[in-house]
Regions:
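Short beta-strand element of the alpha/beta-hydrolase
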Residues: 1-4, 70, 397-398
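Primarily recognizes the serine-hydrolase "nucleophile elbow" in alpha/beta-hydrolase
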Residues: 57-142, 224, 229-247
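C-terminal catalytic histidine-bearing segment of alpha/beta-hydrolase fold enzymes
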Residues: 131-135, 173-272, 398-405, 414-417, ...
């Protein structure tokens, strides 16, 4: 991507008027368009870590407290913000930082660190090692169109990915806020399923309590997808706000009318006017009414390498193919079930494509699976993985997501929230009803709410806190803050 062509004070004024310094370092995207300038994982996060190290190297001549750095991001930027929060000082990044020319030691010879204090993540696209399976369990299993048409190879793969996700949930043993281990006894039964249903109901009930009627539903703009060589937006947080207007709208005069619209195909929402709360019949009914699958089977690691994530794990210098497969779970299914799959319609053999890609090494000698681990927050947070407790994780996280989105499964963000909470971190998690893949907030402005969250953290830690000494740094998509 090219650098932004303009900087506009109005896009960052909300931060500056609060005494926050907005640092705009920039970072590589998934592809630079140049064979001699590699991008993708883990260079995007490496660039941001390098920026933090630069600021800390120069902390004596720059304003701000470099122990109070916050990041933020939306979508892929939300993932990078999360990674900045989770991967602090991870040794896995050392060789990349050195190749990047990052500051590794200060003038006195002390190691410079790249950990941060807090991360804001809107709709983070994370946990790519299981994202294909999570998408099929959360969304794909409930549909029978396109690549999920019955009696096709891809439908069979979808079913098997769904089963793999059940195995993963039972292996990772996440706990709910009450400390109960969440498991699946069958595909759609068990405490994990019940917890997801509870999250959906809480999101709906938040909407009911937050919303005044008459209420107008406005179709939202999609999050902008920058092409391989497109320009970054002007200086600022980026990403669409909660209610971008696409020109289509529907007004509901009463809450009862809105509930009736949800039940227009079948009754799956029950509203109790006495308690002003609602319940749902099942996750399936919610998904079928509120979410349409926008991705084929292989939602992130596409069988034909057609997704943006395939380019994230590509290698620019490999001119024959700068997109790579990265999902070992999908590969194992293709390999183990090939005889079953090849008897079905639409079959194509992708086994060699996967096996060739997964072990392709980059310029520092790391293969694709190593790079997937580096870009998987839960790799550092769960004892299911070898990376458990090998990084300095931020103390504070704020994760907001639109529960109607089809860009990723809701369970990906829920798993991230639970893993951080189980790790002992302070996490605010909000899944917002009637919001899609946007900077989702229950109420108010996303930037203002983010700033308020930071101020609340700093007030708690400093009784004499004042915005006059609230000094911070940010960057586009994933952004850096400093505070005094």
């Amino acid at each position: 991507m090219s650098a932004p062509t303009s900087n506009d004070y109005s896009t960052v004024s909300a931060y500056i008027t609060e005494g926050i310094i907005f640092a705009y370092s920039g970072c590589r995207g998934r592809y630079t368009g140049k064979e001699d300038y590699v991008a993708g994982a883990p260079w995007c996060v490496t660039d941001l870590k390098s920026a933090i190290r630069y600021l800390r190297y120069n902390k004596e001549i720059l304003p701000g407290d470099t122990d109070k750095i916050y990041t933020f991001g939306m979508s892929g930027g939300g993932a990078q913000s999360c990674l900045m929060g989770v991967t602090g000082n991870s040794d896995l990044y050392t060789k990349y930082l050195e190749e990047n020319g990052a500051a590794m030691k200060d003038a006195a010879g002390n190691k410079i660190k790249d950990n941060v204090k807090g991360s804001q993540c809107w709709c983070p696209i994370t946990n790519l090692d299981t994202a294909n399976a999570a998408y099929e369990w959360n969304i794909g299993q409930y549909f029978s169109t396109d690549t999920r048409t019955p009696d096709t190879f891809t439908k069979s793969l979808s079913d098997d990915l769904t089963k793999k996700f059940v195995e993963y949930v039972n292996d990772i043993r996440l706990k709910d806020p009450k400390g109960n281990v969440l498991t699946l006894t069958e595909t759609n039964k068990g405490s994990y399923y019940d917890y997801l249903k509870t999250v959906i109901e809480q999101s709906l009930n938040n909407f009911i309590s937050d919303t005044s009627f008459p209420w107008t539903k406005v179709a939202q703009k999609e999050f902008p997808r920058f092409d391989d060589f497109g320009d970054l937006p002007p200086l600022g947080p980026g990403g669409p706000e909660d209610s971008g207007d696409s020109g289509e709208s529907t007004t509901y005069e009463t809450l009862e009318e809105y509930i009736a619209s949800l039940n227009s195909d079948k009754k799956w929402v029950t509203y109790d006017s006495k308690t002003n709360t609602a319940t749902i019949t099942s996750v399936e009914d919610f998904v079928k009414k509120c979410i349409n699958p926008s991705k084929d089977v292989g939602a992130f690691d596409d069988l034909k390498r057609a997704q943006g994530e395939n380019q994230v794990f590509g290698t620019n210098y490999d001119t024959d193919n700068n997109k790579k497969h990265f999902d070992e779970m999908t590969y194992s299914l293709l390999n183990d079930n090939n005889d079953k799959y090849k008897a079905l319609s639409d079959y194509a053999n992708y086994i060699n494509d996967f096996s060739n890609d997964l072990y392709k090494v980059d310029s520092v000698g790391k293969n694709v699976l190593d790079r997937v681990n580096m870009y998987n927050p839960i790799y550092y947070l769960s004892d299911h993985y070898n990376g458990y407790k090998t990084s300095d994780v931020a103390d504070y996280f704020r994760i907001n997501t639109g529960i109607f989105q089809s860009d990723t499964g809701n369970v990906v963000e829920i798993n991230l929230y639970l893993a951080l909470m189980n790790y002992g971190k302070n996490v605010q998690f909000t899944s917002v009803w009637e919001q899609q893949h946007v900077k989702a907030e229950r109420t108010g402005d996303s930037d203002a709410n983010f700033i308020q969250w930071i101020n609340e953290i700093e007030k708690t830690n400093a009784p004499n806190f004042s915005k006059d000494i609230n000094i911070s740094y940010l960057v586009i998509l994933v952004s850096l803050f400093f505070l005094f």
